[in-house]
Amino acid sequence: MGLCVNGAVPSEATKKDENLKRGNWGNQIEFVLTSVGYAVGLGNVWRFPYLCYRNGGGAFMFPYFIMLIFCGIPLFFMELSFGQFASQGCLGVWRVSPIFKGVGYGMMVVSTYIGIYYNVVICIAFYYFFASMNRVLPWTYCNNLWNTNNCAGVLSPNSSASFNLSSQQNLLNLTLGLNQTLKRTSPSEEYWRRHVLKISEDIGDFGEVQLPLLGCLGVSWLVVFLCLIRGVKSSGKVVYFTATFPYVVLTILFIRGITLEGAINGILYYLTPQWDKILHAMVWGDAASQIFYSLGCAWGGLITMASYNKFHNNCYRDSIIISITNCATSVYAGFVIFSILGFMATHLGVDVSEVADHGPGLAFVAYPEALTLLPISPLWSILFFFMLILLGLGTQFCLLETLVTAVVDEIGNDWIIRWKTLVTLGVAIIGFLLGIPLTTQAGIYWLLLMDNYAASFSLVIISCIMCIAVMYIYGHRKYFKDIEMMLGFPPPLFFQICWRFISPGIIFFILIFTVIQYRPIQYNDYLYPDWAITIGFLMALSSVICIPLYAIFKIWCSEGDTFLQRLKNAVKPSKDWGPALQEHRTGRYAQMSSTRSESNPEAQPLNPEKMKEDLSLTIQGSNGQAHTQDSKV
């Protein structure tokens, strides 16, 4: 009986797939779109524009793109080539040096944390999406049950403060007066805090589960599962919509935004360069951190997605396209955000800095409030939150697939491959259950705690160790030859230098910067207690600790009479390291093929008829020339 690939019937998988056991992307566009959806997430919309205006406007673009060239693209290319060469997920690739397999487990832990709270953000976007399907947005006025006496809506003729606005000057006086006396709160802020979250006073006060959010969380996980029900075979089709439609929405919102009064002021505030700020270390640190985190490096997702590529796919080209697309999207989103915020600031008669925000405050408070000022505001709100949902889902697909692929590759038997859909369902159910505490009244505190600690400096450490393991333990010369065997050309000299020296140096700089700039987390005026911060550090360490723990375990289990012998055996590549298919095991890997085939029958070519036809492999190099490799079969 044939193997079931990614939950699909065998006949569907054997038409074009090179690796019949794991399956491949339907075509290269699916991989590129999936990777774009993975890299382009919520942070591109709600974090980058804020960092840009805070760090010198247009001047911030200079360090940002410098970090992209010297750190972002090289690391992206390294992870793609790593996964594609071995055709394995974030665990299986560490056959390259088994002692470092803990790095893969660390990536799984990080992806688990991110997947839990990221889907809660998506579920909140679902909630706002459904709430926008009204004639009047529910956060427009102050006449709702959840509003307080301090609420003062910019459109409220009968607000709780009982002011009657007759002109823009009166509106300005109202705003200034409220700031001095009542500390004005907007309807959107009260809707967010008092209706959606019903936020408690302390992180330890969980209160009740918010059933509407719980329902939206279930919807979110159901959508993710259905899109991954056949692995990359189904998600590869979904991304044609989820990865492209956000750009349609961004363009619609941009065109609408620039036609509004005050939009130019917002855009100028966003772009006007303050060149003196590029001399500040914090600006360079923010640029490096944003590049590193926004590309999804060290999460395990890039390795996983690339593992489903065909062996000779040009991942060098893909890494450049995807990285530049990610950064260009961030810049483009800034125009969309600040054109609307500029209009809002003009309407209120205040400076743009008074309405600018980042994170959940931008997505669920500031921007929704600005949308209430537009005609047909429910339409714009529906589009905005639908865009957030799609951006979040694109990342969530890869986070879940990273975990599922790691489990399936690690077990590796026919049964687990046949029932991969059940593994996906199991991981989705566990993710849903672990996300329930984040739908309580203290959920936002825990969400921000996980966001700040679970995937912060631990990612930097994981990425740094990965560079050291591949470049210095396995050996840069061997890795460069591996890439040449796979692509038909060695990595360009620039990337060789970056991988060995520049990128690890920048990663180390990010780590030092993160430590120096560390401040205890707070949410608005709420300061997190020490015990909560301790839990945050434990979450961060839980991924990093996998590396030394597994190294100790591997040394203990390795053969050898002395510690040095065990260490040497734990460090050197395992016998089954290399291309997954024997037809690709040429050069120095051909010498291991006979031994590997005898000891592992599954390593035999899965498509011998194809191999008989393809006696030579022609690979298109970056210079446009054809490189021919004779088949060793």
From Swiss-Prot:
Catalytic activity reported: glycine(out) + chloride(out) + 2 Na(+)(out) = glycine(in) + chloride(in) + 2 Na(+)(in)
InterPro entries: Na/ntran_symport, Na/ntran_symport_glycine_GLY1, SNS_sf
Highest taxon in the source lineage: Eukaryota
Transmembrane segment boundaries: 31-51, 58-78, 113-133, 209-229, 238-258, 283-303, 330-350, 373-393, 429-449, 453-473, 493-513, 533-553
Ranges of Polar residues composition bias in the record: 591-602, 617-633
Its job: Sodium- and chloride-dependent glycine transporter which is essential for regulating glycine concentrations at inhibitory glycinergic synapses.
Protein name according to UniProt: Sodium- and chloride-dependent glycine transporter 1
Recorded name of the encoding gene: slc6a9
